[in-house]
Amino acid sequence: LLIKRGIKKGDKVAILMMNCLEWLPIYFGVLKTGALAVPLNFRYSSDEIEYCVNLAEADVLVFGDAFIGRVEEIAERISKGRLLIYVGEGCPSFADDYNSLSANCSSMPPRIVLSDDDDAAIYFSSGTTGFPKAILHKHRSLVHSCKVEQYHHGQQKDDVFLCIPPLYHTGA
């Protein structure tokens, strides 16, 4: 989906969604393309969304139905040179529909070489003293976090795990 839309290694894809079935495939799909995932706090105001999308220099904003109003408020200002992809039913006119775009995508993994030292994600601080600050993570950092969580919870391959924290948070 993203590669067909011109997204390549080093590009940035902001994700503004509540925890949902599509969240993880989108997040890991972004990482597999070599692009950087930029998860956004679902509590952000329109101004904070605009600030973070611009600061991260996101090439794409993927957003869910809970954010139509907030994204619509800033769509004209942030859409120039940036893809807006909507995940949900009833796609707004200012965005592309995720379901339509993903309907004919290949299930084959992209042939993109990634290393532990490649940039992987940009997370944002809580912004308690002003606008949120961007924090760059390498693939090594994300893999290490996964290993720590797996060890901490003692998860096995076939376990079912209920994730309560928001997925935009590094601790989720």
What is each of the regions a protein language model found here?
Residues 1-44, 166:
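Conserved AMP-binding/adenylate-forming
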Residues 47-48, 70:
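Short acidic active-site motifs
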Residues 56-57:
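Active-site charged/polar residues at nucleotide-handling catalytic sites that mediate phosphoryl
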Residues 68-116:
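ANL superfamily adenylate-forming
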Residues 103-124, 131, 154-160:
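Conserved pre-ATP/AMP-binding loop-to-beta segment of ANL
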Residues 121, 135-156, 161-168:
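Conserved structural elements of the adenylate-forming
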